[in-house]
Amino acid sequence: LVRLSGIDAPELRGKCSEERRMAAQARKFVWQRIVGAGRVDVQQAGREKYGRPLVAVVLDGHDLASDLIMRGIARRYSGEARLPWCPPS
């Protein structure tokens, strides 16, 4: 497993249906972009706190993390406390 550098994305096993829905949407978007890409560039950008590689992925010249953020299915992240994906109860 790897993590995209610089983003926080919702979890497929998230705490609420909204988070799980957004996670499925993000997963589908990533899959479609990778399968449809003519060129895929991956660069390791370090390791995260659990030891998984952090990577930057560029598909046909477009940064995948930025595309996820622009679609609202990921947030910028640089190690600070994560914001919840679930609405307040």
Regions flagged by a language model, labelled:
Residues 1-89:
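Small beta-barrel nucleic-acid-binding modules, primarily SNase/OB-fold domains
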